[in-house]
């Protein structure tokens, strides 16, 4: 920013325009004396003065343009600096988000956030009964992957990662039956909604790990302080996806290894590349209620999910991905 302001200040300096040297002025005065002696009008003097006036006007225009350009440059530097200093947007309530226009939300990061609750109690205060959970939202705040440590002789552990995906990883608009039993236990079944998102993270060593963040077909039960369950993790790639050699699960080549007949292409080391596996796997999630507001039907909490990563259609061994974050729902 300092460099931008310095450049702007430099642009605002008046432009220096060269003037005629003293020798030319002396010649001009001599010509004027001769003209007066013979009664001749000094046209050359008028031409020289006119030229100097035009040069001064041109220099003034350049100076004004430089000032305008410098001010614009300085202003843009301040705007960029302010934008970078904003950071994470303030978390809003559901009603506050609904009151925003598209242009007010665009580019702020609010669309990737789950709502919060204004007021309420720090516990699960809903009476026993059958409810319908709507607007169920899960927002990850941490992605860790279980992998070999960068330090020697260290066992595999969950390592911090760098997010390579844009802010499109939040699950939202999920709904399903939510039951509160008389003994205080709860049960939730996921039925519909935006229940998956493709995410890619990068390990400290540079390896990138893609996975499908999801809670498809989740059935979670337990106490409100900690209710958990398993869910379905579909294949990251579909059966119609073709690899660089044109091989796929339901289309493409069966065998892309150019070898004579004899079964060489179906050997064990090549089978996992030739035979695509699109089978699903399972993951487990634990949710905890931290605050609720019965008068509006809102409830929020935190979650921790562990699920497998992408297998490249069966060619790679999946890694365990731990996802931690917050969740929000409305019970009706």
UniProtKB/Swiss-Prot annotation:
Subcellular location: Plastid, Chloroplast thylakoid membrane
Main localization (coarse): plastid
UniProt keyword list: Chloroplast, Manganese, Membrane, Photosynthesis, Photosystem II, Plastid, Thylakoid, Transit peptide
InterPro entries, alphabetized: OMP/PagP_b-brl (IPR011250), PsbO (IPR002628)
GO process annotations (BP): photosystem II assembly; photosystem II stabilization
Family: Belongs to the PsbO family.
Sequence segments annotated as region (Disordered): 262-282
GO molecular-function terms, A-Z: oxygen evolving activity
Organelle targeting peptide span: 1-85
Pfam family, any one: MSP
Name of this protein: Oxygen-evolving enhancer protein 1, chloroplastic
Gene Ontology CC annotations of this record: chloroplast thylakoid membrane; photosystem II oxygen evolving complex
Gene designation: PSBO
SS bonds (residue pairs): none
Task of the protein: Stabilizes the manganese cluster which is the primary site of water splitting.
């Amino acid at each position: 920013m300092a460099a931008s302001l310095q450049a702007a200040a430099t642009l605002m300096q008046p432009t220096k325009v060269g003037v005629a040297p003293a020798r030319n002025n002396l010649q001009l005065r001599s010509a004027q004396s001769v003209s007066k002696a013979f009664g001749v009008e000094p046209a050359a003097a008028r031409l020289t003065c006119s030229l100097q006036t035009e040069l001064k006007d041109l220099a003034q225009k350049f100076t004004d343009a430089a000032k305008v350009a410098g001010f614009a440059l300085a202003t843009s530097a301040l705007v960029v600096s302010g934008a970078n200093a904003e950071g994470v947007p303030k978390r809003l309530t559901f009603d506050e988000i609904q009151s925003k226009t598209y242009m007010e939300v665009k580019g702020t990061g609010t669309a990737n956030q789950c709502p919060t609750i204004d007021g309420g109690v720090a516990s699960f205060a809903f009476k026993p009964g059958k409810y319908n959970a709507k607007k169920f939202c899960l927002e990850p705040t941490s992605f860790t992957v279980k992998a070999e440590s960068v330090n020697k002789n260290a066992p595999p552990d969950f390592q911090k990662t760098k997010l390579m995906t844009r802010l499109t990883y939040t699950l939202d608009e999920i709904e399903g039956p939510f039951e509160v039993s008389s003994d205080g236990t709860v049960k939730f079944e996921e039925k519909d909604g935006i229940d998956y998102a493709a995410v890619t993270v990068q390990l400290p060593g540079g390896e990138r790990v893609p996975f499908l963040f999801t809670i498809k077909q989740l059935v979670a039960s337990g106490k409100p302080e900690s209710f958990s369950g398993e869910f379905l993790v579909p294949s990251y790639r579909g059966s119609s996806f073709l690899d660089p050699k044109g091989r796929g699960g339901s289309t493409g080549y069966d065998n892309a290894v150019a070898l004579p007949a004899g079964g060489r292409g179906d050997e064990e080391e090549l089978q996992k590349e030739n035979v695509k596996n699109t089978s699903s796997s399972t993951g487990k999630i634990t949710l905890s209620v931290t605050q609720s507001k019965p008068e509006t039907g809102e409830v929020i909490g935190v979650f921790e999910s562990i699920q497998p990563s992408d297998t490249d259609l069966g060619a790679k061994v999946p890694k365990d991905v731990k996802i931690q974050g917050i969740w929000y729902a409305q019970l009706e």
